[in-house]
Amino acid sequence: MFASLLVVALIGAIAWAGSAVGLSYLFGVVLPYVAVVTFFLGVIWRMVYWAKSPVPFSIPTTGGQEKSLDFIKQEKWDCPNTKFGVVVRMFLEVCFFRSLFRNTAADVREFDPVNKGPRTIYYSSKWLWFFALLFHYCFLLVFIRHFRFFMDPVPGWLTFMESIDGIMQIGSPRFYWTGGLLLVAVLFLLARRLFNQRLRYISLMNDYFPLLLILGIVLSGICMRYFDKTDIAQV
């Protein structure tokens, strides 16, 4: 974790130093375009690499009861046998993280009255699903909401979305719920890796780095809007 934190701090320090010596155009215009191009090229390369990789046999990732005898109930969305069922399953997975919704956790009960001793128990755990969903959708809305700085005139649907996001009219400038909820979601995902011993044991630098980087982006955005009150339109 500390290595990831050091890298994120180093990135912030380089950006601050570049701005201090008059390289604002490089860090504010050139590098963002380079980053976007690099991102799309990397995604395309990865997709081509995966497409060329040999797949000797099919590895299903379904769950639940497959289609069998008529009197055995099939899990149609978890283990579909039709194209429509596959489309529904993919939609639920991509848009609602259905596999995380089925997440379970294991624990050891020190004394179980039935076994008269320790017993391993399994229970449903929806926290990861909830905060993962909250994180991704808030991040998406924040990303879309920033399009208003690049459009003139601003589309009506974007203005409407912005008004809904700040519907409570708290503070000046008004508080956007997606920014606050995104911060809460990132802190939960980071705390989950820090305080869960088993998860912390298997976590690598590239597990912490995205969370810390996004946390830095969120905190800097909140600071610019509510504390420093930076005029982004002028920038």
Protein language model features and the residues they cover:
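Generic signal for short, ordered secondary-structure residues
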Residues: L26, L69-D70, G117, G166
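Juxtamembrane/interface segments at transmembrane-helix termini
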Residues: V21-L31, I44-G63, F188-M205, C223-Q234
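Alpha-helical transmembrane segments of integral membrane proteins, especially early/N-terminal helices
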Residues: M1-V8, M47, P80-E93, L128-R145, ...
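Alpha-helical transmembrane segments
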Residues: G12, V34-W45, L141-I144, L181-F188
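Transmembrane alpha-helices
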Residues: M1-S24, V29-L41
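Structural motif marking the loop-to-transmembrane transition
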Residues: M1-F2, L23-V30, P80, F84-V87, ...
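Membrane-interface amphipathic/juxtamembrane segments adjacent to transmembrane helices
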Residues: L31-S99, V108
